[in-house]
């Protein structure tokens, strides 16, 4: 894949999360014929290999060519997984439209030649080449020579073009062309037929290997265990297929309503028509009525306004107001023109329009942006259908270990062939014995053993109200070493209590008006702002909306109504929202206030603005938002000089502070024509709204538990920086002895380059710091003692963006100690999580779903505290809306990881014990009988495999993690040491039994009554007690090796069953302990009981009691040595840490490398300094390593 023909290679979705490499290939008839012949002569093995390795299928059938000539494309993901897939290039024929619309090859099919659709149509035959990848269509752009996504309006369109080109709808001809090329507007998730699920599961390499093993066992008349494996496989496959089928049905029900909605579509010539939503295409003009409607596509609002419930996307059921896209004479793309807040104009698929307000034309109109799987809901569904692979390192290690076992089996096969060929055995017997070695050395149950711990952990989590849609991520939970938390609704309570209002005038701030006293708020602009500056709606007689807005409005004791119901005021449009004072409100000179227009709140802008009309009075604009943002839009002389210190008083106590401002407008301006920039300027500052947002009771103890376990905790919030710092201190995320350093970065302005400054936050000394974005207390100096303490960096989303753009080399150094990230937008939250992952942290993200969906999806482990549909994108959802689920999840993850490794070690040892025993017996051209194999495989190993994993998670989080890799020194040493120990014991038993005075190769007798008499034990081969069926297996070597191997399997299970510090002690697993006791008792009973019939069944020989005691002694010594080695060496963390230090081993994790390289620089952090992006030294700074997390990554 290193050399490509010209035009053969390209990138699909370049720069996006689902970026892929695409390679062009052309099918060759001769290659196809050869592969068909190979499939026949290999009895279907070749197609199976091609199924497992898609790239091999393409390389075998096709030759490389340019993408333009390709009929097959090979796709490879650009992430670390490098997953291959292939797709056939298909043709879409538009020739059918010739007769319907009279199209000619030269006829422009679209009104603009720049549209992708025009460039994708091959003329004169009117055909389109396309591929379908993960439910998305990509068409070949002949002009640019690349595959491009179709099903969306082009991003380059400006707002003026959207209004002009699509404001009147599409012609019928354009609709039909787009329908053919873009496909139907459906999110089809078919309920996968059971037979398909069954075939897919059966073709798993694990089950193919089992099929091979079963066939071999049937040929050897080893029917009992073959049937047992078949039954277990059927149960396993049935459960898996059932789970997959249930998930498929649930997902189908989740999206099926989307495909059967009737909508009103306006055509350019056809007028308004009622159509099925499945026929919608990008560019269609939707007409929204006042009725509730579920959006079947993504659409941009161009006229009127809507109130939308976006709970499915955000996890939050607070209605959101959408405003029309302004028509501006500019060629700038509409998303760029709207900046980060373009979503305020977009109605997303799957959201519910609960209220549509018409504009002057009397209609609410929206242009379809995206259809089908290109929509927001389609993207969410695709993330479920095609999840990002997890725990790849563990899977890769498992494959490597299996390959080692295969290598061992190969050596055993060569040994077997040599022994049996030299012995003159028949060829078919030699082959059968050689193949037996594979099923012994590579046990069919090995892959399943790795998942059993996960299954039990999932059940325990379910009992705690934690639900999981991606069970494989439970193991990843055991590796978490950094957890990010949203603040509002996650660390703090959902509800906000209005504590008071601080108004201001020319003399500065007035006394706090407390609502606890029950006194009504005096009339004035501040009262009017509280009554009208919100996004509340009246739905079925109930006021609904953001809790903050609701608390603020309720404090005024005003009422809400529609203008069309009780009021008929000139200049107020029909059905405008009107607020009016009630009887209990203070004396008000106006009859009411009509809300004419809203500029909705967004987390990116951190403010909202409304235009209102006092009935019989002035037209006003009110703004509400983050204090620092609102103050920046006000006339400087109206902002009190004590603004910073006043704000500090409340934010340092953890209050949430909102600022209010207003201005008068001219009555002759139409409210909807005014731009946001015009309205939001030269405002008059009104005061501060103080709301209380208390910590949840569970927050502090949970964070203390995580920190004591050396798991980093990070806060990512959209709230004020000072409030975030206060919450971090109150919650224990930042202790009293630790310092907080503010990092502030500013964009390039004029001639000055981007800058970054570092300041120590001081809680005791109050000094004014007048920057608009951050109002916190600082101090100028840091004592030497302070420098030696722990530091936590705090910064805003704006600073994070500037650092990412202009100081990227400093970003990893800042993240080493970055703890508080405030004013973060949803996109910045996702980016921050990704940056932590680049430093090799295992990142967890816990949020309530509101604005956290991207970060929840990006993290290794996303934990949603919301039960909305958005939680579908998160692997874990907690029914209990607090962060107590986080330590529970980590504990269960650690337990599941340790359990998986324990089972892996046990299954590997069990196979090696049996492997060693069989190869020793092969030396004597002997083996174990079917019943002997059955007893070991079914009665011992299967029962242990089922019960060994029942240990629960240890209730305490320890300050280190379990090993995250199968190929780790302690685990490898444990496996190799125990294999060698068992090998030594088996060889010793094998040799010693042959040197006993009573030993004879001619003994084939069952037990005698007086077996102490050697003479009675030594019988002739022709003795009547001899049984023909036993002549192949019965020998003293067989008896000795079988007892040693069988009981060794039991003792190894006890040695490998781990308890503290990650799992409950073994003695608490009562079922497992009982199984071991019964198994050991049965084995000892068989060993010492003289029951001829039992011995005949198991093909065993009686031996003197002294030899039986010798077997027990050998097993006891083996158990004691193994247990001591496991506890004193393998599980001795202190010893391994000392060995690491002696050999100078250092972690290769990126963040550990940063810590080692930058830990001892006395100049870090550069306090009271400002660096600029054009200064060379700013990119070569050094970082401070936080001693709190110094040994966070140490693991065995």
Curated annotation (Swiss-Prot):
The entry sums up its family as follows: Belongs to the cation transport ATPase (P-type) (TC 3.A.3) family. Type V subfamily.
Q: What is its EC number?
A: 7.2.2.-
User: InterPro entries recorded for this chain?
Assistant: ATPase_P-typ_cation-transptr_N, ATPase_P-typ_cyto_dom_N, ATPase_P-typ_P_site, ATPase_P-typ_TM_dom_sf, ATPase_P-typ_transduc_dom_A_sf, HAD-like_sf, HAD_sf, P-type_TPase_V
Catalytic machinery residues:
486
Q: Which residues lie on this side of the membrane: Cytoplasmic?
A: 1-31, 53-197, 245-400, 458-900, 954-972, 1057-1070, 1131-1196
Please list the GO biological process terms of this entry.
Answer: intracellular calcium ion homeostasis; monoatomic ion transmembrane transport; polyamine transmembrane transport
The UniProt entry, under PROSITE patterns, shows: ATPASE_E1_E2 (PS00154)
Name the positions where Mg(2+) binds: 848, 852
Keywords of the record:
ATP-binding, Chromosomal rearrangement, Endosome, Magnesium, Membrane, Metal-binding, Nucleotide-binding, Translocase, Transmembrane, Transmembrane helix
Query: What SUPFAM superfamilies does the record tag this protein with?
Result: Calcium ATPase, transduction domain A, Calcium ATPase, transmembrane domain M, HAD-like, Metal cation-transporting ATPase, ATP-binding domain N
Q: Which residues cross the membrane?
A: 198-218, 224-244, 401-421, 437-457, 901-921, 933-953, 973-993, 1036-1056, 1071-1091, 1110-1130
Tissue expression pattern: Expressed in heart, placenta, liver, skeletal muscles, and pancreas. Lower levels of expression are also detected in brain, lung and kidney. Weakly expressed in the adult brain. Expression in fetal brain is higher than in adult brain, with levels similar to several other fetal tissues including spleen and skeletal muscle. In adult brain expressed at low levels in all tissues examined, including the temporal lobe and putamen. Highly expressed in the respiratory and integumentary systems.
The domain of life for this entry's organism is: Eukaryota
Q: What is this protein called?
A: Probable cation-transporting ATPase 13A4
